[in-house]
Amino acid sequence: MNPVPPNQNSNGASAPAAPSSGAAAGPSPTFSPLYQQIKALITQSLQSGEWKPGELIPSEVELAGRFKVSQGTVRKAIDELAAENLVMRKQGKGTFVATHHEERAHFRFLRLMPDEGVPHYPESKFIEVKRLRAPADVARLLDLKSGDSVVYIKRVQSFDGVPTIVEELWLPGLIFKGLTAERLNEYKGPMYGLFESEFGTRMIRAAEKIRAVCAGEDDGALLKVAPGTPLLCSERVSFTYGDKPV
């Protein structure tokens, strides 16, 4: 969970089991719409790590042979996966598993852009990193039991030296068992990239609510604004494969 306080040719047929085509064979879909079942099977392979973030997945022809379906069915499934940012098409190269280490991925959840439209990368300063018991509201959002271990992170993100975001993150302690303040300070890439590469957890989508708030004393001090200053509060829950909140 990532609250930020101050800021679908179904042919109607089933497919038989398919032989391997350059990759480990998996079960074939047994009900329609067919392309949705192919999409689900490809997603299972992504989730299991058969194809890792940044890796090239089999071609549409190979996947069609693997699942005994038409190439058009595979293409439609991949189109949806690309629209959901699970894979990326690269002209002349093929389709790759999406990764948070891609430059464009950095702004998928952090949707801040200056007036001139050129993305700026924030600097982060960690204020607090600790392991504690999940409060009831956090446990509910993360589908945990009240009192389960969570990692709490508070940081300030600045653009061009101006503190802009005070961010609080609550992460399931079991998944992020080895996450420490020292590792966060050492790591220089996007935080979601760290979660992906070192903890095997990829953020797939997010549910977000935004509301207007007034700055409190603590957050105001971190943002260098007076208490009562109007701010935007974004409350976000991120989900990984299987729609599991993380």
Protein language model features and the residues they cover:
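Residues in the helix-turn-helix
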Residues: T73
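Extreme N-terminal segment that seeds HTH/winged-HTH DNA-binding domains in transcriptional regulators
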Residues: M1-V69
